[in-house]
C-alpha cells in the first residue's frame, strides 16, 4: 500500500492534516479513518491522540470516527489514551461514545471497562 511504504509515510501524514480541520464532515472522516488505518502506532500515537483532541466538527459521522479511532488507540495504547478521557478535552458525545466503543471491545479487560465507565458524562 502506498501509505504504508516508509518512503511515503511523511508525505501521506502531511497530506492528511488539512482534512482533520476541514468544514466538510466527510473530509474530516476520511482524514481520521486514514490516520486510524495507517498511523495508530508507537511512532505516531502521541500525535494521533493530540489530533483527535483537536477535531472540532459537530457532525455525527465526524464525532463517531473520532470515538472509533480513540477506542482503537485505547486497545493499543491504553495508558496514553485514558489520559485523554480523563483530561476533559472531548465533548460529551465523543467522550461517551469512545467509552461505549471501548466497552464493546473484546480486547479490553472487564476491570478497565468498569473503570472507564466511571468517566462517562451525563
Label every model-predicted segment.
Residues 1-122:
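Alpha-helical scaffold domains
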Amino acid at each position: 500500500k502506498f501509505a504504508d511504504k516508509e518512503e511515503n509515510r511523511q508525505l501521506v501524514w502531511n497530506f492528511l492534516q488539512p482534512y482533520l480541520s476541514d468544514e466538510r464532515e466527510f473530509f474530516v472522516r476520511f482524514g481520521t479513518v486514514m490516520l486510524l488505518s495507517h498511523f495508530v502506532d508507537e511512532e505516531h500515537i502521541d500525535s494521533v491522540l493530540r489530533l483527535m483532541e483537536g477535531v472540532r466538527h459537530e457532525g455525527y459521522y465526524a464525532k463517531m470516527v473520532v470515538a472509533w479511532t480513540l477506542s482503537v488507540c485505547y486497545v493499543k495504547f491504553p495508558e496514553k489514551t485514558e489520559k485523554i478521557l480523563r483530561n476533559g478535552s472531548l465533548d460529551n458525545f465523543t467522550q461517551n461514545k469512545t467509552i461505549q466503543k471501548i466497552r464493546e471491545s473484546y480486547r479490553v479487560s472487564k476491570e478497565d471497562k468498569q473503570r472507564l465507565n466511571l468517566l462517562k458524562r451525563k
